[in-house]
């Protein structure tokens, strides 16, 4: 069995999380089918473009088949400009937004990846669902049970899917070498 480095584990789980979003109801048993655009690609927007968001942005721009990065959003204009340049280096030209509410008006977006600051996750998730988008949200989805329940109720009400990223870590491995006695 291969011993994974932390970096390999994180890369694998990040790509797996994106694949789970793309797979939609086949993985999580939701009642709403995951619908892409007419050409079969799922058109994705990434919100919050610093560390986690940058990784998601580059994954959807270059690594995930069936996923197409169509929009990016960040309130920091310097970060937004830098990420737009990163996308253009790999041949992707997403629409840019500094206002999340304007992004939600774009009917060409099928799914949203939320990697904004934690305190914005619940409301941005609910707004995304209300706008008819499936949502993949970095942890934490909410700061308390009530917020989490509101997001789940919104997913049911609008027949959309939520995928929340969760990392599980295993306890350190211990050697059980038999004693020589």
Please place each PLM-identified region on the residue numbering.
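N-terminal glycine-/serine-/threonine-rich beta1-alpha1-beta2 phosphate-ribose binding loop
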Residues: 1-137, 149-162
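A contiguous active-site-proximal alpha/beta segment in oxidoreductase catalytic domains
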Residues: 134-136, 142-181
